[in-house]
Each structure stands twice: as C-alpha cells, then as structure tokens.
C-alpha cells in the first residue's frame, strides 16, 4: 500500500478510544496487520503532547531508553489492546501508521512490535506522518536499529516535526523522508492533512 493511501486511511479511519485519549484501529489484509494511530483531537491529547520531559521507557526485558513522557503515557494505554493481534502467529507482516500525535505513538508501537515479534524484524514497517520527536538522549546504534524500517514523513516546513526542540536532547528515529517544497506552505499549513496528502500524491504521480 502506497504512503498516500496509508495516510488517507489513517486520517479517515474509525477509531477505538482508550484511556488517556490513545486512539487506534487495526486492519488485517491477508497475513499483514496494519495498526493505525490517531492524531490529536481534544484537550487531553494536547496536555500529553506538551508533557515532554523525557522518562525511561522499555518493553518487557529489553534495554531501556528515554522518551517523551506524555507520549509514553498514552502509548501504555493503547498497548494492551494490541497484544493479542500482534502476537497472532498467522500475522507475518506488521505496518504501523500514525499522523501527528498518532505518529509519535507509531514510533512507540513500532518499537513494541520489534520487541514482541523478533521473528518479523525484517517484515515490519512504520510510517510517521508529521511526526514530533519522541526519542531523547544518545543515539546508540544497538538502540536506533529498532527503527531501521520506520519512516518519518515531513512536509517541508512542518512545525510539528521540529518539536520538542533538538536543543533539549530530542531527535527523530528511523529514516527522514521530506516531501513538498520549502516555502510552499507556512509552518502550520505544512502540517495540515490535506496538504500532506496533496504532496504525497504529487510524489506518487
């Protein structure tokens, strides 16, 4: 499925709502599981978005790392709802997709899948459209390889992809893919879903 189609599904999906405004839906196509995570849609989301001091985080017995505290709180609310589907042995490929606030959750979801399904590490993919920074601290190769197949999609000038500030120790993980042209949109308009979709479709022509 091409990025424009994934993004459209993410923006227009019907979501299951959990505690702390962590919203998701899943789709099974053949042996592929798609996990979609929703953007901000209320005051609780913004409280979590702005709660950005870093905190230790880890899945199970894996080595811990530091992440945006608010996003970790929301992800912990979503994780139990996905455990059964992720563990299903008939699932042979997993794709995580998120936009904005949901893209930050997709970063955490992707790492969760990497740990929960070591048999699928070469068959997991992730897409964070308009993704904020989630990771904090030194970028050790043994740690960042967890996101080797995760793509941060940035519409150039998108302000959300530049927060929290790198000066505070935050950084993106995975591969950065830039779309659009610098100066085409204001920093806020570059984050709007209709403009991201327009640039994705333009790139697929």
Question: What residue ranges belong to the model's regions?
Answer:
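Non-catalytic, mobile gating and regulatory segments of ester bond hydrolases
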Residues: 1-97, 101-205
